[in-house]
Amino acid sequence: MNLHEYQAKQLFAEFGLPVPEGYACDTPQEAFEAAGRITTEKKVVKCQVHAGGRGKAGGVELHDTKDGVKEFAQKWLGKNLVTYQTDANGQPVTKILVEEASNIANELYLGAVVDRATRKIVFMASTEGGVEIEKVAEETPELIHKAAIDPLVGPQAYQGRELAFKLGLEGDQIKQFVKIFMGLGTMFSQYDLALLEINPLVITGEGNLLCLDGKINIDSNALYRQPKLREMHDPSQEDEREAHAAQWELNYVALDGNVGCMVNGAGLAMGTMDIVNLHGGKPANFLDVGGGATKERVAEAFKIILSDDNVKAVLVNIFGGIVRCDMIAEGIIGAVKEVGVTVPVVVRLEGTNADLGREVLANSDVDIIAAESLTDAAQKVVAAAEAK
């Protein structure tokens, strides 16, 4: 689950990190009043969406009047912001962040992720702030400095000092950086984060450090024990189909192809997408129905897949391990009837009672294309999609 910039900064402030004075606003009038509370001559106004590239898309502006801030809010609130990280429809803007402008002398980068290879939280710092860290890692990896946090002992001050020295910080800046580093390390573990970034972490004209931007991603598997963070969830930033799927405990990701995929198991789902690609097709989605492929969940999965007008055929690929294939076949038949599926449906069953499952499909009054193998299924569904 992603957080907005203003939410990330709220958490930063909670852990004693320096952030600009700012206010998240729902209306143009609120933005106008917020600008009046900020004492700096210039104010920064930012659209709050779960996507990067806001500045280049016109979603971040500098204003020196309250009326200018209000006009910006009137322009964007209720509209969609399209950036290089969004689709053509963009992301809806429901909040505007109004904050004090900062006197920037230098820009740094500071971020942290879970390194699954070492099973540690790894902090990354660089003097190349304000640009995509992926680009820095590709072109000048020597400019990225790392510190691995042992989960048994947590972040240590000496690690923060080492990073500060490598960034060329001096004097009181080192103490400030260590405080930021320690706060972020504690926050990462306490809130079950998967990723956090401060890009840029700036050095102001007065020589102080300031968290000018914030990006936080929370491990969705841990949200059950993070009620405070759950309340920060903004469903408007999610694909409607993905949000609907989550309600049924279906793992769905929308793609831009024309072959709908319904599979049980994430690994099998990825393999299914690969083989569809291999045979010239383009998957329209990733959808894992999980181990409990009941009639109800299969029906909802069909509804979600078919809500995409680009879908011309559906491939159902089920491995019967926990559940029996004959039961799954009956669920598929019932779901196809209930939903009123009008596109070709190719079904491949393997595992427990697979032969019986195929027999159930063959004896049904529903027009379903049976496949003997995964390759056969991919070839048939690609051909069916091309024929539509």
From Swiss-Prot:
The keyword Coiled coil does not apply. Mg(2+) binds at residues 199, 213. Gene3D superfamilies: ATP-grasp fold, A domain, ATP-grasp fold, B domain, Succinyl-CoA synthetase domains. GO terms for molecular function: ATP binding; magnesium ion binding; succinate-CoA ligase (ADP-forming) activity; succinate-CoA ligase (GDP-forming) activity. Its EC number is 6.2.1.5. It catalyses: succinate + ATP + CoA = succinyl-CoA + ADP + phosphate; GTP + succinate + CoA = succinyl-CoA + GDP + phosphate. Heterotetramer of two alpha and two beta subunits. Succinyl-CoA synthetase functions in the citric acid cycle (TCA), coupling the hydrolysis of succinyl-CoA to the synthesis of either ATP or GTP and thus represents the only step of substrate-level phosphorylation in the TCA. The beta subunit provides nucleotide specificity of the enzyme and binds the substrate succinate, while the binding sites for coenzyme A and phosphate are found in the alpha subunit. This is Succinate--CoA ligase [ADP-forming] subunit beta. It comes from Vibrio campbellii (strain ATCC BAA-1116). The gene is sucC.
